[in-house]
From Swiss-Prot:
This is UPF0114 protein YqhA. HAMAP family: UPF0114. The chain crosses the membrane at residues 15-35, 53-73, 136-156. InterPro entries: UPF0114, UPF0114_bac. Belongs to the UPF0114 family. It is a multi-pass membrane protein. Keywords: Cell membrane, Membrane, Transmembrane, Transmembrane helix. The keyword Chaperone does not apply. It is found in: Cell membrane. One of its GO terms (cellular component) is plasma membrane.
Length: 164
């Protein structure tokens, strides 16, 4: 009975495989939205105000960071929790594949969230005259919470690695 339960639990990790594949579909959706934004802005590029163009560019950078985050979570999560990726030797392989454990993935995700939040906060500040002060305050508080959380996670990781 014990062997059956252990084998069943170990095999259940494959339930995550479609979830990680779903992230690749989310990446496709993000890419479509990215190019939709570019197609939308190109006809208006010469009539746009510089600040509006910067807001669009920040939005594109934001989507790019989210896309990178999706790739990182998709591949690292799959390798850490499901199975190693069998990529043939003659194909290009991302140099961080197989080297990122769950803790380093968590720290990279936290750093990515801080970067994404920073871009979002910059977009909000560029339109600050149209945003109520209390809403600006909450954006800053939320961003600082992300920054503090990422810092604490990195610090705790450093402490645990140093003690082992």
């Amino acid at each position: 009975m014990e062997r059956f339960l252990e084998n069943a639990m170990y095999a259940s990790r494959w339930l995550l495989a479609p979830v990680y594949f779903g992230l690749s579909l989310a990446l496709v959706a993000l890419a479509l939205k990215f190019f939709q934004e570019i197609i939308h802005v190109l006809p208006n590029i010469f009539s746009m105000a510089e600040s509006d163009l910067i807001l669009v560019l920040l939005s594109l950078v934001d989507m790019t960071l989210v896309g990178g985050l999706l790739v990182m979570v998709m591949f690292s999560g799959y390798e850490n929790f499901v199975s190693q990726l069998d990529i043939s030797k003659n194909k290009e392989k991302l140099n961080w594949l197989g080297k990122m454990d769950a803790t380093s993935l968590k720290n990279k995700v936290a750093a990515s969230i801080v970067a994404i939040s920073s871009i979002h906060l910059l977009r909000v500040f560029m339109d600050a005259k149209n945003v109520p002060d209390n809403k600006l305050m909450w954006y800053v508080i939320i961003h600082l919470t992300f920054v503090l959380s990422a810092f604490v996670m990195g610090y705790l990781d450093r402490l645990t690695r140093h003690n082992h």
